[in-house]
């Protein structure tokens, strides 16, 4: 086991928001803006369309002409403290795992998507009739929970293991779920795509599907050393072998039961 010591590790202050402010339309938009490193215009407009499910509206994004001409996708990139959990109550279903991302940075696509969706609802345009009764002032917004985005649509996603100076390893996430769920929380990047706008009474949220997870191949733990300084300690002896044998992983019962949450979960759409 190797270790690299970095003394007095300092990170830039992370934007924070109160739970109450993240549950308002204006608050969630402002928070998404605060974690965006750019304000470049990406989205021309968004249309919400009725779907076969009464509580769900499909999301259609029209990018700016300059981005459309470059065949740019509508995927959204996030970065943050990431952890894959087993969902105790749903092991027999396809959503037996879900990803929790405590977002520290996001593409401007995220705040512009939220801004466009709630702008549509406010002005009663580009939305299905089922949403006309909604008032942005009374909505309880649930896209973020504890400054995190939860994603349980993982089917078809890829995971890319990266390491400085070495070729990355790209794999289907289906075969990596068990080993990833045993890792500690790690800084990672995620590429996601919006799926539906979900409404339950006055509670609303945008749900996402994972397209790609980009994560360090090496499992590293931050510990406080004997001198009181922060140390980054590698928990893997050989990264290549560990990927195959699932060594260097935290062997704990790190499962999360959505049904134990006192709040009504609406991120399972």
Swiss-Prot record:
Organism: Variola virus (isolate Human/India/Ind3/1967)
Similarity comment: Belongs to the orthopoxvirus OPG079 family.
Record has Coiled coil as a keyword: no
GO annotation, cellular component aspect: host cell cytoplasm
Induction of its expression: Expressed in the early phase of the viral replicative cycle.
Function: Plays an essential role in viral DNA replication. Binds to ssDNA with high affinity and localizes to cytoplasmic factories where nascent viral genomes accumulate. May disrupt loops, hairpins and other secondary structures present on ssDNA to reduce and eliminate pausing of viral DNA polymerase at specific sites during elongation.
Gene Ontology molecular function: single-stranded DNA binding
Listed name of the protein: Protein OPG079
GO biological process terms held by the UniProt record: chromosome condensation
Note: This protein is synthesized in the early as well as at the intermediate time of infection.
Subunit structure: Homoomultimer (Potential). Interacts with the small subunit of ribonucleotide reductase. Interacts with host FAM111A; this interaction protomtes OPG079 degradation through autophagy.
Cell location: Host cytoplasm
Keywords: DNA condensation, DNA-binding, Early protein, Host cytoplasm
Taxonomy, superkingdom: Viruses
Pfam families: Pox_I3 (PF04661)
Record gene name: OPG079
